[in-house]
Amino acid sequence: SFSRKYFLEKFNSNPYLSDYNYINFDIESIDLIKDFIDDKDLGGLNVTIPYKIEVIEYLDEISDEAKEIGAVNTICFEDGKRIGYNTDIYGFKESLKASSINRIDSVVILGTGGASKTVIYFCKKNNIPYKILSRKKSKDCLSYKEINHSIFEGNVLIVNCTPIGTHPKINECPDIPY
């Protein structure tokens, strides 16, 4: 995960944070979260693909925004409670600002997991039309095979919410008509 390196650099560069550590818990199943979620030595957890939706059932509380989004990527341990938040929405908004994107006519969302729920939430809040694409067709989603170039016409923002293109699959890309 990119997060470990990022946070360790932050902790090591700040004398007030030098006692902190960041550990990856790579789990094969969400059920394995039980092995460490109640560890009193942990200050919190980050949640990544594919558990941002499934982790909700293990929490005591969830922020209103995370509830609306339907996905959690940050768990804080406060007063003996496991509280879930979604900070992906903040990161998504900030990445748009940093990219100087001024106009979005529509959004094409690749993938159907927790990250896609964040982008859907953003689109709904900003009245931006969107389409969801995935490998498999479903009620709310087109399959990659069903689309053509016309879906990408205009000021379309394409958001990859799949694990494809991230470590270790950095040279792969979703199967869409580029």
Give the positions of each predicted feature.
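Glycine-rich adenosine-cofactor-binding loop
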Residues: 1, 84-89, 96-126, 134
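Phosphate/diphosphate ligand-binding glycine-rich loop within oxidoreductases
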Residues: 1-99
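Short glycine-rich anion-binding loops that position phosphate/pyrophosphate groups of nucleotides
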Residues: 47-54, 114-115, 163-166
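Conserved beta-strand positions in the Rossmann-like core of class I SAM-dependent methyltransferases
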Residues: 23, 108, 131
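Rossmann-like adenosine-cofactor binding region
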Residues: 140-178
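NAD(P)-binding Rossmann-fold cofactor-contacting core
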Residues: 125-143
